[in-house]
Regions:
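Extracellular glycan-modifying ectodomains
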Residues: 1-281
Length: 281
């Protein structure tokens, strides 16, 4: 897309940045006013000073001082004096996946699966125990939901763009996240609407938003059926089929692939799932 004689709108964001740009461009006023450019914060992409000098709008997910030259305060100090800046949401929600862990070394870690695998049990025994252990007896599922809500409220406090109440109102009726940090198109559109309001720009065209895709659609992190039941979800039952990198899997099939990958000594679970696209694995 070619932009001529438009100030840059820099988005310093994670993987949510690209779909947010598409949602913002659905606003005719935003599209006329700015040439958006995304710099991925988690990839530590450097923003050239020439781009900061040409910046007419800086949208950023907050990064603390531990990020050094990419810290939000540092980047804000490098902007032109009158450049408007807005802290935007960095949306995360573990609610549907209480056993999720961000521990390094494997994709989409599950604390109970990892514990059972690390005990050295045979794969079929790992799966049997995992699928039939009463989660509500072993874990305080209500407290785990409260924990992720509290963490997200603290993160949301950095931005005037509110989204958590929307999540809490609707997440039981329909999926608003594909994974813990991959929001649905509906939630991306909700965040974009809040950004446009803060900037006093015209809202997005509803017809354009109806076609919005996030780029996350190829994978939905399967939900443990017991978690779905405990939290009263209208989705995520035992027979639910999930998109998993080119094929569909039930939760039990996904868990079996997790166990097989880990017991094979593989660390790239995403690659493992992608390679299984055309197989019976």
């Amino acid at each position: 897309m070619l932009y001529v004689n438009k100030p840059l709108a820099i988005l310093h964001a994670n993987c949510q940045g690209e779909p947010l740009v598409h949602a913002l461009l659905a606003s005719p006023e935003f599209r006329r006013a700015f040439a958006p450019r995304v710099y991925l914060n988690y990839a530590r992409q450097q923003i050239p000073q020439v781009d900061l000098d040409a910046c007419g709008l800086f949208l950023y997910q907050h990064l603390g001082s531990e990020w050094g030259e990419l810290a939000s305060a540092t980047l804000l100090a490098r902007l032109p004096e009158r450049c408007p800046a807005l802290c935007i949401p960095n949306m995360f929600f573990r609610g549907m996946w209480p056993l999720w862990s961000g521990a390094p070394g494997f994709d989409y870690r599950d604390t109970l699966l990892d514990h059972l695998i690390d005990l050295g049990l045979p794969g079929k025994d790992v799966l049997h125990v995992y699928l039939h252990t009463p989660l509500a007896a072993k874990y305080d599922l209500a407290a785990l939901l409260d924990e992720t809500i509290a963490l997200e409220r603290a993160r949301q406090a950095r931005t005037p763009v509110q989204y958590l109440d929307f999540v809490l109102e609707h997440f039981r009726q329909r999926p608003l996240f594909h994974t813990v940090n991959h929001p649905s198109a509906e939630l991306i559109a909700h965040a974009a609407a809040g950004i446009l309001r803060e900037l006093d720009l015209a809202p997005a065209n509803p017809h354009a938003l109806a076609a919005l895709r996030t780029g996350y659609e190829e994978f939905f992190l399967p939900i443990h059926p017991q978690a779905a039941q405990f939290y009263g979800l209208a989705y995520g039952g035992e027979n639910t089929q999930y998109p998993v990198y080119g094929r569909t899997r039930s939760f039990a099939e996904y868990a079996a692939a997790y166990v097989a990958c880990r017991q094979a000594g593989e660390h790239n679970f995403i690659g493992y799932l992608q390679a299984a696209q055309g197989s019976t694995q």
